[in-house]
Amino acid sequence: MSRRIIVGTLQRTQRNMNSGISQVFQRELTCPICMNYFIDPVTIDCGHSFCRPCFYLNWQDIPILTQCFECIKTIQQRNLKTNIRLKKMASLARKASLWLFLSSEEQMCGIHRETKKMFCEVDRSLLCLLCSSSQEHRYHRHCPAEWAAEEHWEKLLKKMQSLWEKACENQRNLNVETTRISHWKAFGDILYRSESVLLHMPQPLNLALRAGPITGLRDRLNQF
């Protein structure tokens, strides 16, 4: 076997290995609920990780005890802390995925044939460096594309956190109203039973009737 064939075979094997490692790496950084790279990941008691917003927003009744989405083990939903290392790795993976997307032929600047690295905050569009300094965009605000992407995810996280807080508040209000209605219903049942008992109790004899004469009773007794 020639040296060229051996080298080619080794290169293909290396590419396949890298591809396999990349897929495993990507899978480990993907939330099993939203199937995207983690946003503010939290690791629960059983060891599995989820995006914090995904974890919170998938419980309608907001129980204290619940089950893991993957292993179905009962877990505590308290004091969830961000997995900092996993968050950083997911952020790097998002940036790498973004650069892979921007480097594709479809996303190259049609005028200058350069990668669109800049984001125009006015036009909300991706531009290459030359386009961002052109007359049309010169006075617009620009930032690197990865900054814009991370800012987008942070805003999304805040919105989802706000939704979760509102859901918690609504659930608390609902619990208060449910308890109040239950108490009023119990009070109404007590009143109903009390009224029923009073209606079936024997009524006392009217003293005025018992003290008065019964007309004709003596005459009837004398007939015997």
UniProtKB/Swiss-Prot annotation:
It is an enzyme of class 2 (transferase). GO terms for biological process: innate immune response; regulation of gene expression. Changing C46S: Abolishes PRMT1 ubiquitination and MAP3K5 activation. SUPFAM superfamilies: B-box zinc-binding domain, RING/U-box. Pfam families: zf-B_box, zf-C3HC4_4. Zn(2+) binds at C109, H112, C131, H137. GO terms for cellular component: cytoplasm; cytosol. Its EC number is 2.3.2.27. The keyword Electron transport does not apply. One of its GO terms (molecular function) is ubiquitin protein ligase activity. A zinc finger (B box-type) spans 104-145. Keywords: Cytoplasm, Metal-binding, Transferase, Ubl conjugation pathway, Zinc, Zinc-finger. InterPro entries: TRIM/RBCC, Znf_B-box, Znf_RING, Znf_RING/FYVE/PHD. Belongs to the TRIM/RBCC family. This is E3 ubiquitin-protein ligase TRIM48.
